[in-house]
Amino acid sequence: AAEPHPVGTVEHALVQAYLVGRMAELGLEPTLQAGLLSPAAVERIERRGDRAEGLQAVNLIGVLPGRDPALPAGLMMAHYDSVPGSPGAADDASGVAAILEAVRAIRARGPAERTLVVLLTDAEELNLDGARAFFSEHPLRDRIGAVVNLEARGGGGRAMMFETGPGNAETIAEFARATRDASGGPSSDSLAVFVYRLMPNGTGFTIAAQRGLAGVNLAFIGRPAQYHSPSSTPDALDQGSLQHIGSLALETADHFLRAERLPEATANAVYGDLFGLTVVRYAPGVGWLLLAAAAGLTGFAAWGARHAAGLRWAEVGKGVASGVWLLSSGLVLAQAVRVLAGPVGRRVDSPETYYTLLRRLPWMEVGVGLAMLAAVLALLAGRARIGRMAIAGVLVVAGLLTGVLGGFDPVGLGALAAALGLTFWPRGEDEGRWGGWLGLIVLVLAGGAVAQGVAPEAAHLLIWPALAAALAAAATVLIGARLKAWAAWAPAVVATVLAGGWLLGYGHGVFLGVGMDVPGALGVIALLIVMLARPLAPEPSGARTLAVGAAACLMLACGLSLAGRAAEPAPPPAAIAVP
């Protein structure tokens, strides 16, 4: 990864020769497979001003024999080409290096039962042509039973398992067992897999999954400025990320190679890791049981608060309305702050613009996070205390800004209408601590029930925090529903620290993945954290301080988003790596 090495260049040929030598040193007896470039690949080559005539995708294939050649083999896969203009230390020299080191480690552990096939694909950046050639033409394709693919969309951060083959329940169970001892621990979530399936993106693993193969796709996406960038050098690459993805790949592949049987397609599992320590997984139907448990605990807490603290059902309804206001106003503010950093949606009309926005992503994340904090502080201060006209004015300006800079957005318009309506609702506040807390829990449980019915793999993001909040509320009733003793605050503090800390890390991953296009996704994270911490909010006497804090956060958010433009200006087109 010293120099860019796209298909057809001298540097590409040098990298190919070097890798063949390294594979031979590791006892893989490498062979080459040449395949035709697709029309889309040819078009990309010609678009950058080069000739495609005579070029092919040349895969490098190595085999580490197992003790039983009749068993289905394991496959480790990465691509060795880069885009023009980028050395590709992360994408995907890191994956190639990690695989070669994993081969060395697997050999050192002694012979495995299954054969390991190493596939370093070519022309991935052009149109996944190397993977297509292997899985459609190579004789080994029918021997593969499980796949571990390594990728990168950035130059750092924790490596995450973000894609599986179809029907992944058995795959997830094996991945969880395999990565218990991985350096850095497991990092994966069924929501990420669900969302990735809906995206137009693809990697070499996409071709394997289309054949129905079990397996996992690993990648890190932190330090997004390095993606397809001249800055993607070995010195700039996060060595911790390389270690993490390598350890996950090694332990998973080694587990597959020594397993009595490989995972098969069954149902999809619901799962997520807890702070990288373990993977919680269960069948989709279990989500309904968790919802029922959370609803029961919430009902118990409401009963206790009603009898001990005089809770009225109308206050719970106001708490629900406050949560809807937070979601809608947070989305409006997030979109406005986001468009200050650059175009969004269909207005991102070139690779140059896309990569420039990636470099600005850290600025966007902090800015959008501050915008969400502003909405939270305004919620806690009270719309009436701040001034309904003042809040409405801010929301309208934010909506107009989004429309002018970002274009027509029906979701944003709907959110603006909801936020304005609730801002002027005269009976939409004064829900009290218990009403506000339980109302937010009820809102999240309702959202969790909808998600459980439509997409159970995504519902746990709502169900788990709601269950934690419901447990805390029920425990608080048992300790002291009047919230007079210090001990009564303990359940909410514990839930906020543990579940809230998990959500903060989750939110960072969400923004790295989809924040450029859907910044309002952080509104869900904000709602969940407020749900956990709602009883800890200060008394109404501190409303002025909260209002000042909200204004300061929003102004700082706008300033940071604009600063991203100045700090990361759009470079000349020639300086951009175009895939």
Segments from the language model and where they lie:
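Soluble extramembrane regions of membrane proteins in the secretory/endomembrane system
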Residues: 1-282
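Alpha-helical transmembrane segments of integral membrane proteins
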Residues: 294-579
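Cytosolic-side membrane-insertion boundary helix
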Residues: 264-294, 312, 357-363
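C-terminal domain-closing interface element
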Residues: 142-163, 287-310
